[in-house]
């Protein structure tokens, strides 16, 4: 495995270079702006390329040493892509709403996750002695908990790295990461504040094609990290008679 490749052409085709209208900009983004066209800021992709490459390396390195990456993107056009990318790279995600204290009050979140597991257990057991009305109430509770916490139910603790789409919308997540010393990789559009972002990636954070490209690259970098971690253990995973259980699945089985 190796870090995923990408080209300037791919970034252009995905519209990564299109910022917001010039009057909506954050002046702190000035170093990353190439210019403007028809009152739209154009992001300097000559800076995006090395900064994106650096972020991919950080993701791979984090996973290679056994770390966990949390994908965060709750805006409509990012929600599904965030979940799919995190799942296929065996990582974690928040794609519905960031609950205040999700990282800084992990104990309370853990209790809610335990409640989700318990409700799951009740609903999956036959003849549990609950009436139809009670089961309906439990199903609604499970749906609500799953929507909020489904992407982190197997995380087992705060993550080692966070990847964020839209730093304006996910301001609370960034504040919590900063308080806990969790490094942040984030897309910074022309209307964003790049301060407190450890690994900023200048680029459009609204276009679906751009979001898909970022998430695909981050997911592939995480998969590269998994391969490196397995390689470092000296095991030939493919030659094993029994495939290893992924940590997330192991946690679920033991819950």
Curated annotation (Swiss-Prot):
InterPro entries, alphabetized: Ribosomal_uS2, Ribosomal_uS2_bac/mit/plastid, Ribosomal_uS2_CS, Ribosomal_uS2_flav_dom_sf
Coiled-coil intervals: none
UniProt keyword annotations, A-Z: Ribonucleoprotein, Ribosomal protein
Region (Disordered): 232-255
UniProt GO molecular function: structural constituent of ribosome
UniProt xrefs under PROSITE patterns: RIBOSOMAL_S2_1, RIBOSOMAL_S2_2
GO biological process: translation
Annotated Gene Ontology cellular component terms: cytosolic small ribosomal subunit
Family the entry assigns: Belongs to the universal ribosomal protein uS2 family.
UniProt-listed PANTHER family: 30S RIBOSOMAL PROTEIN S2 PROKARYOTIC AND ORGANELLAR, SMALL RIBOSOMAL SUBUNIT PROTEIN US2M
Protein name: Small ribosomal subunit protein uS2
